[in-house]
């Protein structure tokens, strides 16, 4: 993805520029999102407008988990001290939704935890219903959904869990 390459390698976040404030940080970047914001684990059956039975496959969380296991095996970053979980455009939803999972399961010893969400805000009264019944997201995700603002719910839950030890 060209935009991810520019962001990470050409003067962006993980730049080799001497004065980069992000030098030596480990980063998890979500450049975009799956239809379930990387949080689904199941199938949703429905009938389309022509009366045909259809299935939506929501495997974002399953795929994310497999990818993270492979990344952790290959990258040698399991002892990272400073970590940034970030996403832009629809990837910001993935960053906000999965940051707790990332810090709990992959970087539990990081002392400098950071989450930066860019451009992922949408008000929708049925986030909880969608996450539970359509995407079949894990309860570790759905239990944090309290309002019509999914991103803010996730960020609030991070603040409640980590307090001042996480930078949002």
What are these regions (language model features)?
Residues 36-38, 92-94, 122-126:
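Flexible loop/turn segments at secondary-structure boundaries
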Residues 43-44, 54-84, 99-168:
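Surface cap/lid and interfacial helix-loop subdomains adjacent to catalytic sites
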Residues 88-99:
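Glycine-rich nucleophile elbow surrounding the catalytic serine of serine-hydrolase chemistry
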């Amino acid at each position: 993805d060209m935009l991810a390459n520019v962001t990470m390698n050409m003067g962006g976040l993980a730049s080799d520029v001497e004065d980069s404030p992000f030098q030596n940080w480990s980063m998890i970047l979500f450049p975009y999102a799956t239809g379930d914001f990387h949080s689904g684990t199941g199938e949703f059956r429905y009938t389309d407008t022509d009366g045909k039975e259809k299935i939506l496959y929501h495997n974002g969380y399953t795929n994310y988990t497999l990818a993270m296991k492979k990344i952790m095996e290959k990258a040698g970053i399991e002892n990272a001290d400073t970590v940034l979980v970030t996403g832009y455009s629809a990837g910001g939803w993935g960053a906000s939704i999965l940051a707790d999972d990332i810090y709990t399961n992959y970087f539990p010893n990081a002392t400098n935890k950071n989450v930066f969400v860019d451009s992922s805000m949408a008000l929708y009264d049925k986030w909880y219903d969608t996450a539970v019944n359509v995407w079949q997201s894990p309860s570790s995700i759905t239990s944090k959904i309290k309002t019509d603002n999914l991103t803010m719910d996730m960020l609030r839950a991070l603040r409640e869990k980590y307090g001042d030890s996480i930078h949002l």
